[in-house]
């Protein structure tokens, strides 16, 4: 099997990047179809439109209705065709960006994504999650290439709720450990090949950046200001983690996250919050050294990520519920089977309960 690495064609980051990106966007198309929900359009829409128009790029802005569904994609594509735009810009959170990617794919147009939060590593990826109109998961759309441009305006992201940035750190926390597991197992990555040394190195840099800058970045976000630490964490959450996961692979941490989604008491948690606990469970599952586990526990406590089942909202009927989570985690096709050893529901059940006790012990110190 070939080794494979993929990434966006261009990644831009910095204060006011949502305005300054126009100088690069003009190389992609002479007109853009801009989508965002009402809140984001008021927050950043004017910035983006001005950034395009200042470089003589025509644009048409349209409201996104909030659901990345085939019906919404088709509705927006019809408007795009009527307007004759030759590129797509999505501004906002995951569903808006996924919709922009889908429109670009179906219309064979360049795509620019402008996240307003740094809560996951999804913006750089070559996939969209499609839902029904009722908001239920329908399918993944896998694209032949990543977005043409990812634009991270750190001045906008600094004003977002701190918990979203911390959730992004939780998602990014898993990247190194899952990438290394996939590398050791010679597993097939999301990119369709085996991991390169470059992708593995980016995953490691992601982890090292979290440990060095995470707490400082959280405080900057709390103050709503841009610092060098915040810049580095935004890059880690988005680019380093994005390339690391897509070109190396996912393993136990994300599968355990998926298992926890069956519990109603975990529905209030953000993606990265569940992934962070899944990372602790993966470390137990693979019998990582205690000093490594304690490093991760300390990081999670400092930035505000859950390290116990109680913090996840699971407080009653624990044994039975975790047995169900473990069974879901090990479903056929789940990424936990990328681990470099055989995994069973029983071993996952044991790892989760042990991770919980390790978290309790750490908090009681």
Give the positions of each predicted feature.
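A short, small-residue-rich loop immediately preceding and capping a beta-strand
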Residues: 80-117
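A glycine/threonine-rich phosphate-anchoring loop and its flanking beta-alpha core
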Residues: 105-198
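C-terminal charged capping/lid subdomain of soluble metabolic enzymes
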Residues: 288-365
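Short glycine/serine/threonine-rich phosphate/pyrophosphate-binding segments
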Residues: 41-45, 95-102, 120-124, 249, ...
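Fold-independent oxyanion-binding glycine-rich loops
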Residues: 15-16, 36-38, 91-93, 114-117, ...
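Active-site segments that bind and position negatively charged phosphate/pyrophosphate groups
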Residues: 190-305
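ATP/NTP phosphate-donor binding region
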Residues: 1-87, 309
């Amino acid at each position: 099997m070939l080794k494979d690495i993929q990434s966006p064609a261009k990644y831009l980051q910095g204060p006011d990047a949502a305005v300054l990106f126009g100088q690069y966007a003009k190389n992609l198309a002479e007109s853009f179809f801009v989508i965002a929900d009402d809140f984001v359009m008021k927050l950043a829409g004017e910035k983006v439109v001005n950034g395009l128009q200042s470089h003589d790029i025509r644009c048409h802005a349209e409201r996104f209705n909030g659901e990345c569904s085939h019906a919404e994609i088709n509705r927006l594509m019809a408007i795009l065709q009527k307007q004759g735009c030759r590129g797509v810009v999505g501004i906002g959170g995951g569903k808006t960006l996924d919709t922009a990617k889908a429109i670009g794919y179906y219309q064979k147009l360049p795509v620019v994504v402008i996240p307003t939060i740094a809560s996951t590593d999804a913006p750089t990826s070559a996939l969209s999650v499609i839902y029904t109109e009722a908001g239920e998961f329908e399918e993944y759309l896998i694209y032949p290439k990543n977005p043409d441009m990812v634009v991270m305006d750190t001045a906008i992201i600094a004003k977002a709720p701190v918990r979203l940035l911390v959730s992004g750190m939780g998602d990014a926390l898993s990247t190194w450990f899952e990438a290394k597991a996939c590398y050791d197992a010679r597993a097939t990555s999301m990119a369709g090949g085996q991991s390169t040394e470059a992708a593995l190195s980016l995953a490691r840099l992601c982890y090292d950046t979290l440990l060095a800058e995470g707490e400082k970045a959280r405080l900057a976000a709390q103050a709503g200001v841009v610092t060098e630490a915040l810049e580095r964490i935004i890059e880690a959450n988005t680019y380093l983690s994005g390339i690391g996961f897509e070109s190396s692979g996912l393993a136990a941490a994300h599968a355990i996250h998926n298992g926890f989604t069956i519990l109603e008491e975990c529905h209030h948690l953000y993606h990265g919050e569940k992934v962070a606990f899944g990372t602790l469970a993966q470390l137990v599952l693979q019998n990582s050294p205690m000093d490594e586990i304690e490093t991760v526990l300390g990081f999670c406590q400092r930035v505000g990520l859950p390290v116990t089942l109680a913090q996840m909202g699971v407080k009653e009927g624990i044994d039975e519920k975790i047995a169900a989570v473990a069974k879901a985690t090990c479903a056929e096709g789940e990424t936990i089977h990328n681990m470099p050893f055989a995994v069973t529901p029983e071993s996952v059940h044991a790892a989760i309960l042990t991770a919980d006790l390790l978290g309790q012990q750490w908090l009681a110190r």
